[in-house]
Amino acid sequence: LPTEDDMGNSEVGHNALGAGRIFAQGAKLVDSALETGKLYEGEGFKYIKESFPTNTLHLIGLLSDGGVHSRLDQLLLLVKGASERGAKRIRVHILTDGRDVLDGSSVGFAETLENYLAQLREKGVDAQIASGGGRMYVTMDRYENDWGVVKRGWDAQVLGEAPHKFKNAVEAIKTLRQEPNTSDQYLPPFVIVDENGKPVGPIVDGDAVVTFNFRADRMVMIAKALEYADFDKFDRVRFPKIRYAGMLQYDGELKLPSKYLVEPPEIDRTSGEYLTYNGVRTFACSETVKFGHVTFFWNGNRSGYFNPQMEEYVEIPSDSGITFNVQPKMKAVEIAEKGRGAILSKKFEQVRVNLPNSDMVGHTSSIEATVVACKAADEAVKIIIDAIEQVGGIYVVTADHGNAEDMVKRNKKGQPLLDKNGNIQILTSHTLQPVPIAIGGPGLAPGVQFRKDVPNGGLANVAATVMNLHGFEAPADYETTLIEVVDN
């Protein structure tokens, strides 16, 4: 990640856990490509640029400075660079955040974008916001949990159809936020219309489209809808012939999208690959919302098995159509039971699971539900550790980033922030806290202890540690192991 002040996220975290090394990730790659101008020299930009003389450039993504999925400054630089390279008509389709940043901050982000687009209009570029909606309700679903979310985005962005119509985005956000149970995350879809009531920016044949998020997981589904001619997840009504590129390639195995502006990090020689080819049979399991993390991201942004005879991946369907605070226990016990079964079967030397509760429910702002979620995760951990005790195994318990351990917004002194009514403001984003790690179990060799000479160990140190626990030396270029054996 760019700096120590950037919040970790699940994708970067699982990349580090699985790869054993730190790779420049989405935000850093995009920053570099924009700063050097390399982005504009690549095949992806050249591809979309062919639409500039006669058609519209559409930009779809999260309007935020959270740095988890996207960044506003990168969007502004991309708009600037495209306008300087021939884009005469630009439409931005915004998705409001309120999850990785403060709820309500979308108004300020929209004002910043509107002001910049107004400056471009003064220079003769027809640049406007065309549509919008909240990230959890419009476009940004993941792992095929709810295609209805993507359809709402498609209807607004491509067809120019939405239940709410406004003359500008700031007015839209302010008005819609006043509706009951509405927040930045769950803002209903809207389109911007002209003085005649016509939408200003539907996507049509010949247009160029860029999804500008750098994080992959919540762009894959809209990328499929934009790129695949053979598509049956919802009725697209029409499928415009466009030039589409992602900010990055979101799925290396699917080659999706086929065109992209920034080359992805090349993550090779992951711990999963090493262990599989050295005879370590592996079982990985989570529910839908984190299944990709214990497989695709763990394996270096690679879909599928290294060796299907040596691996088994199990996905438990997540609840769909509800927010996770409604069912905060999620599928923790089901995941644990699958893990327990895999352990007791003695078919596998490594069993890897992700319990999503504290992250997914922590994002909802409900402290009461998050307490229930954490208790469910605790129960699940006990089920797994009891099985490990039975077979004489070893456990490693850690996390990919912080979230539920602090759900209060704080000032620089650590004091809680209050709203205008004197109530504590709830934090829905990840945190900058270090994550814990616990290693134990009856299979742990006598004398194994944490090293004292790795005071700043992080997620990338876990891979070498796990390889050591399996009886292997880690590759020399991996981040060092966290453990050592001390003779008693």
UniProtKB/Swiss-Prot annotation:
Its cofactor is Mn(2+). Coiled coil: none annotated. Gene3D superfamilies: Alkaline Phosphatase, subunit A (3.40.720.10), BPG-independent phosphoglycerate mutase, domain B (3.40.1450.10). This is 2,3-bisphosphoglycerate-independent phosphoglycerate mutase. Binds 2 manganese ions per subunit. Mn(2+) 1 binds at D359, H363, H430. Substrate binds at H69, R99, D100, R135, R142, R215, A216, D217, R218, K290. It comes from Prunus dulcis (Almond). The keyword Zinc-finger does not apply. GO terms for molecular function: manganese ion binding; phosphoglycerate mutase activity. Belongs to the BPG-independent phosphoglycerate mutase family.
